[in-house]
Curated annotation (Swiss-Prot):
Key words, A-Z: Bacterial microcompartment, Carbon dioxide fixation, Carboxysome, Photosynthesis
CDD domains: EutN_CcmL
Localization (cell): Carboxysome
BMV domain span: 1-83
Gene3D superfamilies from the UniProt entry: EutN/Ccml
GO term, biological process aspect, one: carbon fixation
Complexes and interactors: Homopentamer. Interacts with full-length CcmM.
Protein's name in the database: Carboxysome shell vertex protein CcmL
Source species of the chain: Synechocystis sp. (strain ATCC 27184 / PCC 6803 / Kazusa)
Gene Ontology molecular function, alphabetical: structural constituent of carboxysome shell
Designated gene of the protein: ccmL
Length: 100
């Protein structure tokens, strides 16, 4: 899994039928210091994540296993909303504080 921040939603009115009803989010991956990387992904969302929230993103076959998504063409899935991230040097992220 990887840490990412939700940048927004992706709306697609014309898509493969097995993606109907799947909420899509634009996420930006974060490094080990919580800084944004220049890597983005469109990910399915099964947890109801919102704008600017830090999330856990599963990729590849792990993403497709979540909630029976095996037949959906999903390479990435938001599988968790992060409350806190703590490292040896202290708190990296706290949702209550809305950032660092």
């Amino acid at each position: 899994m990887q840490l990412a921040k939700v940048l927004g939603t992706v709306v697609s009115t014309s898509k493969t039928p097995n993606l109907t009803g799947v909420k899509l989010l634009l996420v930006q991956f974060l490094d080990t210091k919580g800084q944004p990387l220049e890597r983005y992904e469109v990910a399915g969302d099964v947890v109801g994540a919102g704008l600017n929230e830090w999330v856990l993103v599963a990729r590849g076959s792990a993403a497709r296993k979540e909630r029976g998504n095996g037949d959906r063409p999903l390479d990435a899935m938001v599988v968790g909303i992060i409350d806190t991230v703590n490292v040896a040097s202290g708190s990296l992220y706290n949702k209550r504080d809305d950032g660092r």
